[in-house]
Every structure is written in C-alpha cells, then in structure tokens.
C-alpha cells in the first residue's frame, strides 16, 4: 500500500509532471518511485486550458471541457481509503471499479489479485497497471 502524501502541485506544472511520470512508466525503468507516482499523477481533469469567456454559453464551454477531459475526476486518496474502510471487503471478495482511472481504490484493497478495473483513458490505465501490477486492469 502506498502512503498518502499530501501534494500541492501547481496547475501549471501538472501536465509536465504527468508526462514525466508516463515517460518513466513507458521506459520500463524505475526512474520515479511508485509512491511518488501514486501521489503526483493527476490525470487530465482540469488541464483543458479553456476559458469560459471564449464560448457563447456555459453549455458550449461545458461540452468542450467534457470532450477534452472525458469527464475525468480522480477521487481523492483519502476518500478512496475511507470508502474501502467503510466497505471492509475481505481478501476473497472480488472488487470491480468500472472507471478506475489510475486505480486509487485498489491501493486500499486487501487483495490486489481480486481487483478488476477498466477505464477509457489509456494513460490512466498505464499508471494503474504500473501501481497495481496484480490487479486486472483494461
């Protein structure tokens, strides 16, 4: 299990940090500790660089934002931990996260071998597979 280390990553640095993390994962070298990846990868949510004032209506802005972000929102680590604590799954129960993103929930499960997840964001899936190699992630 990776420790939750609160991070304050400036909005302007998030895309750069995400790309460095993905480069490290794709290179196959342990260039960045997995715990740092868990705490620093933020996905594409909020990285759209769109301004509402550039659109005729809020609806048009929201649609453009949705198209870029694919509706992505990573549940905060603390919320994932607390939800798993409340559910208290046993190590024999199978868990499915149908929008697993980077696999935040998997970090707190008692048995990674019984964790299943999928996501439409291939970059988030790559991070999830790296962080939780025993989980079944597509």
Model-predicted regions and their roles:
Residues 1-138:
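Class I S-adenosyl-L-methionine-dependent methyltransferase catalytic core
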């Amino acid at each position: 299990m990776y420790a939750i280390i609160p991070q304050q990553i400036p909005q302007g640095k998030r895309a750069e940090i995400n790309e460095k993390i993905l480069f490290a994962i794709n290179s196959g070298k342990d260039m960045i500790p997995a715990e740092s990846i868990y705490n620093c990868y933020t996905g594409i949510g909020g990285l759209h660089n769109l301004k509402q004032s550039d659109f005729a209506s809020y609806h048009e802005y929201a649609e453009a934002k949705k198209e870029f972000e694919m509706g992505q929102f990573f549940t905060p680590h603390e919320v994932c931990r607390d939800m798993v604590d409340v559910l208290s799954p046993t190590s024999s129960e199978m868990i499915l996260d149908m929008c697993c993103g980077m696999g935040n929930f998997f970090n707190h499960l008692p048995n990674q071998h019984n964790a299943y997840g999928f996501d439409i964001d291939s970059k988030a899936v790559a991070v999830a597979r790296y962080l939780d190699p025993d989980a079944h992630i597509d």
